[in-house]
Amino acid sequence: SQCKAMTVKFTVELDIERLTGQTYTDFIKNLRRSLATWYLHGVPVLPLYNQEADPRGFDLKLTFRGQVTTVRIHRDDLVLRGYQMQGAGKWLELERPSTQTGHLIEGSELLEFGPSYEELAAAAQQDILDISYNKNALQDAVSKLAVSTNTRDRARSLIVVSQMFCEATRFVDIANHFAFNLESSEPVKLPQWMQNDLEKNWVRFSFMILKSNADPCYKFEPQTIYGKIIKTADELLNFLGIVEQHPDTRSPPCAAG
């Protein structure tokens, strides 16, 4: 079925040239607040993920020394879906033409790769863990997205933006890691445990946290993060910067007692 075009709910802007670890941290925290529909023990929860209604997005406008690129991110799941080159007007969408799902961004040109990290890494010809994530990398990403038509450069730059904004918004440890190392002159890599233990589990962790909160009969399965056993949903919640709200978590709880 043809999907509907995404409506943009708000736009946030960030100048990469003057970015510091502190202003980056503040930006991520403000972004979480802008996205929140409610809070669970102080942690923002995203709007209900809805596949029937018109998809909602937000734009992130990034500038560096006069160069501009705007990326469009799906609000319900924080997946980067497209971007706009400098002065081009036309949007480029992360979707292979062969998927036949239609355009999430109206009038967009479909790229040769989809939004998953597997497809992005294949197009970039580089592993997620081999890419650098710091201020230099972000400046380079903005410059490349503003003007480059090279698939490898585009894909690598989109990975940098997705990690440093989408993943950092999802996870406290990832935001802290990027903030602490932002101004490093050496390449800054993503630790493997953050990819394996956190990033690959955000949807599942979100579900477990909200289900535990809504359903007294839900049995929480202990999780392992960085070698530590996490025994409760409240403990797991501490790792999340924002929680995805899946419709399944709102099913009526069992009859307790």
UniProtKB/Swiss-Prot annotation:
Family: Belongs to the ribosome-inactivating protein family. Type 1 RIP subfamily.
Site-annotated residues for Important for catalytic activity: 79, 117, 170
Transmembrane segments: none
EC number(s) given by UniProt: 3.2.2.22
Record PANTHER family: ALBUMIN B-32 (PTHR33453:SF9), PTHR33453
Primary enzyme class: hydrolase
Reported function: Inhibits translation in rabbit reticulocytes.
Active site: 167
GO BP annotation list: defense response; negative regulation of translation
Protein name (Swiss-Prot/TrEMBL): Ribosome-inactivating protein charybdin
The organism of origin for this protein: Drimia maritima
